[in-house]
């Protein structure tokens, strides 16, 4: 039985459906290989099929689902190629962003990062993984704002969907939030010192964590992964 999900009346419906389905796929609430029905999703959100179809197209563009005309849609397995390429591109962008942010950061921006890190700590203490996941993203997005490069975050956001699935799966034991928070604190410390070399090293170490995580996660969930 499909449980209806209420949407906010203000933002575009297709964008809301996309965000909710993306979250469900990234959090593995909808597992790799699961069929997706336009009809069932439209019933879930109590909408016509058109906004659902538009959300499906965007999910496909992000590499999260496969749309096969006349054969239906399904959630893609986690592509090792996309994880490798997405991680490589993200590291190149974010290391450059971090170095630039170190030369531009203001005291008020330091305070913003400090508040974010405090909220991360609270989320960990309360075992609120979904909140930590969002705060982790917000931390990295703040760095692109400090570096005055919104395009960098837009690019990262478009390519990191597959990597996000590995990130979320790693929280349990491979890359626990406590360790990720320590790495965020190292990045913040280097930013406070305006040390471009140190912040780039800290960011590199932080982002390489996904490469270590994916090996173990794949061993434990081999049916969810593909080489393509």
Curated annotation (Swiss-Prot):
The keyword Signal is assigned to this record: no
- The reply to whether Lipid biosynthesis figures as a keyword in the UniProt entry is no
CDD domains recorded for this chain?
WHTH_GntR
- In which domain of life is the source organism classified? Bacteria
UniProt keywords (A-Z) are: DNA-binding, Transcription, Transcription regulation
According to the entry, every stretch annotated as the HTH gntR-type domain falls at: 11-78
- Which PROSITE patterns does the annotation name? HTH_GNTR (PS50949)
Q: Name one Pfam family in it.
A: FCD
UniProt cross-references to InterPro entries, sorted A to Z: GntR_C, TF_FadR/GntR_C, Tscrpt_reg_HTH_GntR, WH-like_DNA-bd_sf, WH_DNA-bd_sf
Q: Which residues bind DNA?
A: 38-57
Q: Which GO terms describe its molecular function?
A: DNA binding; DNA-binding transcription factor activity
Q: What is this protein called?
A: Uncharacterized HTH-type transcriptional regulator YdfH
Origin species, per record, is Escherichia coli O6:H1 (strain CFT073 / ATCC 700928 / UPEC)
């Amino acid at each position: 039985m499909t449980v209806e999900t209420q949407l906010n009346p203000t933002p575009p419906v297709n964008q809301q459906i996309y965000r909710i389905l993306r979250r469900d796929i990234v959090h593995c609430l909808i597992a790799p290989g699961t069929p997706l029905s336009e009809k069932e999703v439209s019933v879930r959100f109590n909408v016509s099929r058109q906004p659902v179809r538009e959300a499906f197209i965007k999910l496909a563009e992000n590499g999260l689902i496969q749309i096969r005309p006349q054969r239906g849609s399904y959630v893609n397995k986690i592509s090792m190629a996309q994880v490798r390429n997405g991680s490589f591109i993200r590291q190149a962008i974010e290391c450059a962003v971090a170095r630039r942010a170190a030369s531009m950061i203001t005291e008020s921006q330091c305070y913003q990062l400090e508040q974010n890190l405090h909220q991360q700590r609270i989320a960990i203490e309360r075992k609120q993984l979904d909140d930590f996941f969002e705060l982790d993203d917000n931390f990295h997005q703040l760095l692109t704002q400090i570096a005055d490069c919104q395009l960098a975050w837009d690019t990262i956001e478009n390519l990191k969907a597959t990597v996000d699935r590995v990130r979320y799966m790693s929280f349990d034991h491979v890359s626990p939030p406590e360790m990720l928070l320590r790495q965020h604190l190292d990045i913040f410390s280097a930013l406070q010192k305006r040390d471009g070399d140190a912040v780039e090293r800290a960011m590199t170490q932080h982002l390489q964590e996904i490469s270590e995580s994916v090996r173990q996660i794949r061993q434990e969930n081999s049916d969810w992964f593909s080489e393509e």
